[in-house]
Amino acid sequence: MRILILFFCFWGSQLFADEHFLEQENFEAWQFACVEEQSQKLCDLRELVFDSNTNEVVSYLSITINPEALTQMQIAFPHAVNLKSPVQLQIDDKDPLELGYAYCNQSACFIAEIIAENFINMFKEGNQLTLKVLLLDNREATISYSLAGFTAGYNRLNLAVNG
């Protein structure tokens, strides 16, 4: 969890200026990147979802592998979400899963989960990940992530972290 929080703390900061990137590569909808922070190499695989009207980021999904070789998933949402209502996550036509929010900071509210191999395989085999969230005004919002390029991107992340 500490790595997820640390990662988000520098995700939106100046540390992502070009001179801090050690590696960066695009895999269709996904972007793999490694940065150096306090002499430590931090890598993630992420996808951003933009508002079609404003072109602002409304959500992002980040995958990291922690020092214990566990895969972590973090999803960021705007503050306008109802924290008491779980998020429904669905990959293609599979049964939806309910996930709870882990925390909020000044930038966003987050789901943070350790995900198992079977869940990673659903990402690899899937085409689209859909999130349904309840907003504070009780409207439901749907956020869709493409899974195109996830397998190649995850393999690249695994290689960077585990050699």
What is the predicted role of each segment?
Residues A17-G163:
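A generic "folded-domain core" signal
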Residues I3-S13:
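Sec-dependent N-terminal signal peptides
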